[in-house]
């Protein structure tokens, strides 16, 4: 390893790092970047070799007093690199500190949260957001996910239900009796659970509403989770681990609007613009069970709960339809088209207006469990009661079947195909 001087008093200017395919390359033809060849090297050792090369190369540039410095893992022109001008010296300082911290984690087989890394060199980073920026840059440089660099995420997601985690150096975390914060530490835990499924809901308000309405009593073998909006990397990683390790079926419940459907696609496939930091953080087995825009007719939701689509909604839908077709998401494509035709959207809360525990009993139970008989209720009586009190009811089987057959016509499909061909995303 090479040592170099840091200046902890450098101003911590905001702004993103300049990054591009390098136009500055080593003037030495015998630079050793053979570790990037197709030899079999453990991922940990490969990442460490990349860091060693990057630090040695940047030291050579500093010794040569080059005006513009380039952080790279190879002399190959095809590899991603980070370039710094004299004005970006503060950013370079932070990125080099981050590289050293990551190397230490890998070398000593340790794991650390972003917050812990920040406090190790608080004087250098100045603010948590600057460390976050450096981590993102380093992940892109090394082409490694955050998890592969032993950096743990303290996500904002929570989980509750029939699952217990045995976490090293922490102990027993029982989600049956308390909400559990979803962090990357759960990825390395032992799991005790006899759950039948995991239900992911978009928002914390829906999560709390279901808990208040006795979700655990209705679904004693169920697990409820939320990322409180846009799905963070830690939540996606943990859900993916649970689906792979324990084969839990995972279902998703989101708003019947463009944003909610986009969140579902992000859970299942990752973001449209993927960065190395979160590579692989998606849950391919998740199944969307609602709220569908077409549920407006299935549950006869009151018209007052419908919100008109605005211009940004139409723009988002037009971008999402080609993607849904490419992904083979027939239901998503159909629901987006229905939304355009009817020009309104709904939030999950709209179905709560139909009555107490209505979402759990008549939306979740039939679609997740398909065992309405196991829930101690009398559907016909309750449906009639809700219909009288709040003008909400289930549609008839004929109505439901008719709506299920409401697919996109051939003209629309041709239009969407043209959108795919011209799509810039």
From Swiss-Prot:
Its main location: nucleus. This is Meiotic recombination protein spo-11. GO terms for molecular function: ATP binding; DNA binding; DNA topoisomerase type II (double strand cut, ATP-hydrolyzing) activity; metal ion binding. Signal peptide: none annotated. Its cofactor is Mg(2+). The active site is at residue 119. It catalyses: ATP-dependent breakage, passage and rejoining of double-stranded DNA. Required for meiotic recombination. Mediates DNA cleavage that forms the double-strand breaks (DSB) that initiate meiotic recombination. It is an enzyme of class 5 (isomerase). Residues 1-38 are annotated as: Disordered. CDD domains: TOPRIM_TopoIIB_SPO (cd00223). Mg(2+) binds at residues 202, 255. The keyword NADP does not apply. Its EC number is 5.6.2.2. Residues 15-158 form the Topo IIA-type catalytic domain. It comes from Caenorhabditis elegans. It holds the Pfam family TOP6A-Spo11_Toprim. The gene is spo-11. GO terms for biological process: meiotic cell cycle; meiotic DNA double-strand break formation; meiotic DNA double-strand break processing; reciprocal meiotic recombination. GO terms for cellular component: nuclear chromosome. Residues 27-38 have a biased composition (Acidic residues). Belongs to the TOP6A family. It is found in: Nucleus. Keywords: DNA-binding, Isomerase, Magnesium, Meiosis, Metal-binding, Nucleus, Topoisomerase.
